[in-house]
């Protein structure tokens, strides 16, 4: 019998959650991570599945995700503990045939349930599937320190925030030319914040929750982690720059245009226009 804890997707989740903890992005039970799988990914591990998988209804149907398996982090679980006990802190779930709920096939032992942000994740998965023709498979939420700090001092506007991050590090425009969506402050763990996040995910692979954290989307765990890491590095640079009295010089609009042309990306027009 093959052991599911040695699968690429469980090992990938262990690495991503451990790396995020070491970065300082996921204190206590902060943060959550979901990865969309295929049936072929989980097929070799049926012998590891629960004999009687628990069924949990969704707060709203998501037919686009019907019959789709995911691996998810658990509610109230600490990222730092995933590496110690994957089965207690992670779960493989599969949405049912009408998208109305899901079964917990593996993991989430002792009656644990998926992250409370699952509505935001699933709604965002739906939008990123449509926006990327199915390429994006990962949604990651974390409390990236410097990005959060900037939401207290910058105007919480997509164009303004995006332009500042682009100027904070040359690679940013190349990595997220679509910019950073920003929500107003909202109560977490609700359908409302999930819907608002998903709406921004139609246009942006990064979405900021002011005074709280960031959502990122990508095709792989590495790409999604790298996306957030890149934005966070720029935010760290900006925090240092602002603390030293602000910018004396920066990357110009013309230079940003040239950067986009060199790497074949189309920068967010509203951010470029500032």
Curated annotation (Swiss-Prot):
Family matches, as SUPFAM superfamilies: AraD/HMP-PK domain-like
Single GO BP term: rhamnose catabolic process
Function: Catalyzes the reversible cleavage of L-rhamnulose-1-phosphate to dihydroxyacetone phosphate (DHAP) and L-lactaldehyde.
Molecular-function GO terms, alphabetical: metal ion binding; rhamnulose-1-phosphate aldolase activity
Entry keyword set: Cytoplasm, Lyase, Metal-binding, Rhamnose metabolism, Zinc
Record-linked NCBIfam families: PRK03634.1 (NF002963), rhamnu_1P_ald (TIGR02624)
Gene3D superfamilies associated with the record: Class II aldolase/adducin N-terminal domain
Cell location: Cytoplasm
GO cellular component, one term: cytosol
Name of this protein: Rhamnulose-1-phosphate aldolase
Cofactor note: Binds 1 zinc ion per subunit.
EC main group: lyase
Reaction equations catalysed: L-rhamnulose 1-phosphate = (S)-lactaldehyde + dihydroxyacetone phosphate
Record EC number: 4.1.2.19
Subunit structure: Homotetramer.
Protein family (similarity comment): Belongs to the aldolase class II family. RhaD subfamily.
InterPro entries xref list: Aldolase_class_II_sugar_metab (IPR050197), Aldolase_II/adducin_N (IPR001303), Aldolase_II/adducin_N_sf (IPR036409), Rhamnulose-1-P_Aldolase (IPR013447)
Pfam families in alphabetical order: Aldolase_II
Binding sites annotated in the UniProt record for Zn(2+): 141, 143, 212
Pathway(s) annotated for this protein in UniProt: Carbohydrate degradation; L-rhamnose degradation; glycerone phosphate from L-rhamnose: step 3/3
Swiss-Prot/TrEMBL cofactor(s): Zn(2+)
Superkingdom of this protein's organism: Bacteria
Major localization listed first in the record, in broad terms: cytoplasm
Catalytic residues as annotated in Swiss-Prot or TrEMBL: 117
